[in-house]
């Protein structure tokens, strides 16, 4: 079956790089860098749509739902990367944000032939996860037409989940299925069709915003401090202390004492120092206010 890619922005030729193979190395890299500068502007143009998805994810988290990313190739790997960073950064359950890739885990390191063309696989992977109406699905595909992602989106719609799309081609088949469309149009790639470049960069920027925004909206950031970070290595043990110090103005000794009294739960230590509560009372107060430090502090 012939696939017509001629109408896709991501498959068109970039006039700025038509002679890139005869440029000096610095000139070549200058072209790439100049093209990359267009990416942030393309993302800026869709901030309202990104905000809608962030708010939907926050509601899902607060209602017992999850964020599920689905994609093939680079798009799938970027979703997995973003999902994998949430537990160490925000202390979240690994099941809260999940990344799926066409072809499964082996496709993370090596392309699995034809996996992205399997529409039924996109649906069955979500069935295996038990996707339901509380969840948010973000379908990721630069082209906006990947069958694996389309199958996943169709299944998500059928169970009542919120469906968003992240693609770099306007008016794609994916946009017709989504409740919310995020379409940063970055233009033709420096190497024609190599959507791991500008399109991939745009996707990474948007995914950063989705999880960061949702975690902020659900109380996992105080000021600009990652107050739910877990002390899983030496660097993060020190980071926890530094966060308590920054949030409260206390000494390192006081920060260490507070953390030791509350099983190294950063939020609890901060509330203990700022409110004078003991560890048990501080934990209870945080639970009462769904983990929001500011709300717990105002209820004194």
UniProtKB/Swiss-Prot annotation:
The record places domain SIS at: 57-220
Pathway where it operates: Amino-sugar metabolism; 1,6-anhydro-N-acetylmuramate degradation; Amino-sugar metabolism; N-acetylmuramate degradation; Cell wall biogenesis; peptidoglycan recycling
Keyword Lyase belongs to the record: yes
- Catalytic activity annotation: N-acetyl-D-muramate 6-phosphate + H2O = N-acetyl-D-glucosamine 6-phosphate + (R)-lactate
The molecular function terms of the Gene Ontology recorded here are: carbohydrate derivative binding; carbon-oxygen lyase activity; ether hydrolase activity
Q: Does the keyword field hold Transferase?
A: no
Task: Please list the GO biological process terms of this entry.
Answer: 1,6-anhydro-N-acetyl-beta-muramic acid catabolic process; amino sugar catabolic process; N-acetylmuramic acid catabolic process; peptidoglycan turnover
* Active-site residues, as the UniProt record annotates them: 85, 116
Tell me the keywords, alphabetical order: Carbohydrate metabolism, Lyase
Q: Give its E.C. classification number.
A: 4.2.1.126
Q: How is the quaternary structure described?
A: Homodimer.
Enumerate the HAMAP family for this protein.
MurQ
Question: What miscellaneous comment appears in this entry?
Answer: A lyase-type mechanism (elimination/hydration) is suggested for the cleavage of the lactyl ether bond of MurNAc 6-phosphate, with the formation of an alpha,beta-unsaturated aldehyde intermediate with (E)-stereochemistry, followed by the syn addition of water to give product.
Q: What does this protein do?
A: Specifically catalyzes the cleavage of the D-lactyl ether substituent of MurNAc 6-phosphate, producing GlcNAc 6-phosphate and D-lactate. Together with AnmK, is also required for the utilization of anhydro-N-acetylmuramic acid (anhMurNAc) either imported from the medium or derived from its own cell wall murein, and thus plays a role in cell wall recycling.
Q: Which family does it belong to?
A: Belongs to the GCKR-like family. MurNAc-6-P etherase subfamily.
> What NCBIfam families would the database entry show?
N-acetylmuramic acid 6-phosphate etherase, PRK05441.1, PRK12570.1
**PANTHER family associated with the record:** GLUCOKINASE REGULATORY PROTEIN
Q: What is this protein identified as? A: N-acetylmuramic acid 6-phosphate etherase
Q: Which organism is it from?
A: Aliivibrio fischeri (strain ATCC 700601 / ES114) (Vibrio fischeri)
Point out the gene that encodes the protein: murQ
């Amino acid at each position: 079956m012939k696939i017509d890619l001629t109408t896709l922005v991501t498959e068109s030729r970039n006039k700025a790089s038509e002679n890139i193979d005869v440029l000096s190395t610095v000139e070549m890299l200058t072209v790439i860098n100049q093209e990359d500068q267009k990416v942030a502007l393309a993302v800026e143009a869709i901030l309202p749509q990104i905000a809608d998805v962030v708010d939907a994810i926050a509601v899902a988290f607060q209602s017992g739902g999850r964020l599920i990313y689905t994609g093939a190739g680079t798009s799938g790997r970027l979703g997995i990367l973003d999902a994998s960073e949430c537990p160490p950064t925000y202390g979240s359950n690994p099941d809260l944000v999940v990344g799926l890739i066409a072809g499964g885990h082996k496709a993370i390191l090596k392309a699995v032939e034809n996996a992205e063309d399997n529409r039924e696989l996109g649906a069955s992977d979500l069935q295996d996860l038990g996707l339901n109406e509380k969840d948010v699905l973000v379908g990721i595909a630069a082209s906006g037409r990947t069958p694996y992602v389309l199958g996943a989106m169709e299944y998500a719609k059928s169970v009542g989940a919120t469906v968003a799309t992240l693609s770099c081609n306007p008016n794609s088949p994916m946009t017709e299925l989504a409740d919310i469309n995020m379409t940063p149009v970055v233009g033709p790639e420096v190497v024609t069709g190599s959507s791991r470049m500008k399109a991939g960069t745009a996707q990474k920027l948007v995914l950063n915003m989705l999880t960061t925004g949702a975690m902020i909206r659900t109380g996992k950031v105080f000021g600009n401090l990652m107050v739910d970070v877990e002390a899983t290595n030496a660097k993060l043990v020190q980071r926890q202390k530094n966060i308590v110090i920054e949030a409260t103005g206390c000494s390192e000794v006081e920060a260490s004492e507070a953390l030791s009294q509350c099983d190294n739960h950063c939020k609890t230590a901060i509330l203990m120092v700022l409110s004078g509560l003991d560890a048990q009372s501080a934990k209870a107060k945080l639970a009462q206010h769904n983990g929001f430090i500011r709300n717990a502090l105002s209820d004194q």
